[in-house]
Amino acid sequence: MRDIASVGLTSREACGDTVRNVQGCHLAGACPYEILDISAWAEAAHQHFLRHPLGQRLPRKFKINFSGCATDCGQAMFNDVGVIAAARQHDDGSVEAGFRVFVAGGLGANPHPALALEAFTPREE
């Protein structure tokens, strides 16, 4: 285990009631339909929750997923928090890239897609 820890890996969040591995679309950075490469946001979420003490006191496992386009290859719609890159057009014709954030999705005993938290979230937020 020391050797594994020495290269930055851990088994701490592998099971139990914690934030699981933050996941993202397998085509991130290469998808022709991608609005944003979600890799940096997925990595930031991963780093925030990795070994975070709050993560060990959750009532159930907690899953976070990012997708770079509306195709949702990452299946963000079926996770506790799903973030899908989106774009909106302003009145002046300019296009702003950001996200649609979804919550409370799941594939358990009663599968259900996530609910939209808000219509659009700017990427700076």
For each feature predicted by the language model, list its residue ranges:
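FAD-binding subdomain of flavoenzyme oxidoreductases
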Residues: A76, A97-G105, P113-A116
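Internal alpha/beta scaffold segment
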Residues: L107-E125
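Small-residue-enriched alpha-helical segments and adjacent helix-cap loops
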Residues: M1-E96
